[in-house]
């Protein structure tokens, strides 16, 4: 026989609102942006919550218990709702406490957090020798600090760095093993994903909400048809418009960083802007030695060093913050980005070619004439020409680099004023007669 009847169950009547008040008085829980949050971070699986509610109710509520549990969870969303729960970027919530960016550590879980990593902070953790040796074998020495800073950057919910990372190789180097180790470091705060899907699917961004890191361990080689979704994730510094299938769009916090492993470059089919490439940290792996024998257990060995890897990544984060979120970038990494940019936009090579055009301060050429010279250059070099509008846009975007000036005051051969550029001279004379005028 029961000696105590809770306030939420009187005279055979179950009061859902009072139950939620009672539940929240003994549980640290809030609801925001479509998710429950606790001192352990975002509640990824609501089943443990449902089970606890079930155990509290089962002695008092008999019929339709499962349905009533669902109703309680829905009411709990209202009772625990907060208007906003912004990310906190000066600390890292860990399995045994909170590590602040200044290096101080507070034990315990006193507050509700957005993300908590499943790794303990141990200032005396041994150096991750397997991990460091793996990176030394995989990457050039000057690129290791960049990886250290990027992984550290992913520890906090911030996009101040404004960069994504692409690690490129020929295949077989073992670069995707990094993703296995990071899944141990970040736990449910990391997702496997696809850069291609993010670029194509307007619902894909919402899947990355509340996530610190998205890893594409085998990036597709096709050029992206559109880049605005990817760029918006890399640069988001606040709430953005997110959309889930069949639901109204809403404002949500987005701080997922993008890391891709690939055998090729991340290219855009139409976007040739400097911004698309400037947002990429592009690292190339060393060639795999023919004599190297791969260790099938290397991922497990490195994952076992996760506490030491945390200290290593935190050192990179502190360096990044000290440098104003400017990543350490080797000359090789900068050159990689320039090569990828040029590979997707041959206008740069055209402007630096000989025999077709000349950069000359007092010269001027119409946009149409320049484009025809460019098409001739492409044809004679077995290259595909971009469209006329894209060609003009590329010249305008880089006019300072080549000391050009866009103007609409060029006089063409017919005496009409047209658009063109000052500071460039055509050395060849393509046939500008329209096909319809020719005999």
Short names for language-model regions:
Residues 204-250:
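Conserved nucleotide-sensing/catalytic segment adjacent to the nucleotide-binding pocket
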Residues 8-11, 65-99:
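Extended, Lys/Arg-enriched charged tracts that mediate electrostatic binding to polyanionic substrates
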Residues 24-42, 47-49, 85, 92-212, ...:
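P-loop NTPase catalytic core of nucleic-acid-dependent motor ATPases
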Residues 1, 35-64:
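Short, small/acidic-rich helices and loops at N termini and domain boundaries
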Residues 66, 70, 88, 186-188, ...:
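Positively charged interface segments
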Residues 303-345:
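Phosphate-handling catalytic cores of nucleic-acid transaction enzymes
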Residues 52, 56, 178-181, 211, ...:
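Alpha-helical scaffold elements adjacent to nucleotide-binding pockets in ATP/GTP-utilizing enzyme cores
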Residues 1-27, 37, 42-45, 120-137, ...:
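Replication-associated primase and helicase/ATPase modules
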């Amino acid at each position: 026989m029961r000696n105590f009847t809770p306030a939420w169950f009187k005279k055979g009547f179950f009061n859902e609102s009072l139950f939620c008040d009672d539940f929240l008085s003994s549980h640290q829980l809030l609801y925001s942006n479509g998710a429950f949050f606790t001192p352990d971070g975002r509640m990824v699986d609501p089943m443990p919550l449902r089970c606890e509610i079930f155990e509290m109710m089962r002695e008092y509520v008999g019929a339709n218990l499962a349905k009533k549990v669902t109703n309680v969870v829905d009411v709990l969303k209202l009772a625990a709702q907060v208007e906003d729960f912004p990310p906190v970027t000066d600390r890292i919530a860990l399995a045994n406490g909170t590590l602040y960016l200044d290096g101080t550590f507070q034990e315990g879980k006193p507050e509700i957090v957005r993300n908590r990593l499943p790794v303990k902070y141990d200032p005396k953790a041994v150096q991750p020798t397997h991990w460091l040796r793996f990176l030394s074998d995989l990457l050039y020495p000057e690129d290791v600090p960049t990886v250290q800073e990027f992984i550290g950057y992913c520890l906090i919910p911030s996009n101040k760095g404004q960069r994504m990372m692409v690690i490129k190789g020929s295949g077989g180097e073992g670069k995707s093993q990094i993703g296995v180790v990071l899944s141990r470091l970040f736990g449910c705060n990391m997702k496997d994903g696809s850069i291609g899907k993010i670029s194509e699917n307007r619902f894909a961004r919402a899947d990355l909400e509340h996530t610190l890191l998205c890893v594409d361990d085998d990036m597709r080689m096709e050029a992206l048809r559109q880049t605005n979704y990817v760029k918006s994730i890399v640069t988001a510094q606040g709430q953005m418009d997110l959309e889930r299938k069949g639901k109204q769009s809403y404002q949500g916090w987005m701080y997922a960083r993008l890391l891709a492993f690939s055998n090729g470059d991340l290219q855009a089919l139409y976007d040739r802007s400097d911004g698309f490439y400037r947002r990429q940290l592009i690292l190339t792996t060393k060639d795999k030695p023919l004599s190297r024998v791969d260790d099938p257990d290397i991922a497990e060995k490195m994952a076992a060093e996760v506490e030491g890897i945390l200290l290593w990544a935190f050192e990179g984060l502190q360096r990044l913050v000290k440098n104003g979120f400017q990543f350490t970038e080797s000359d090789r990494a900068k050159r990689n980005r320039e090569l990828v940019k040029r590979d997707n936009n041959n206008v740069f090579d055209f402007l630096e070619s000989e025999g077709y055009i000349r950069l000359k301060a007092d010269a001027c050429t119409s946009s149409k004439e320049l484009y025809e010279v460019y098409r001739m250059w492409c044809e004679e070099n077995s290259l595909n020409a971009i469209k006329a509008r894209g060609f003009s846009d590329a010249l305008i975007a880089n006019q300072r680099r080549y000391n050009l000036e866009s103007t609409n005051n060029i006089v063409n051969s017919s005496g009409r004023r047209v658009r063109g550029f000052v500071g460039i001279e055509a050395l060849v004379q393509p046939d500008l007669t329209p096909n319809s005028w020719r005999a």
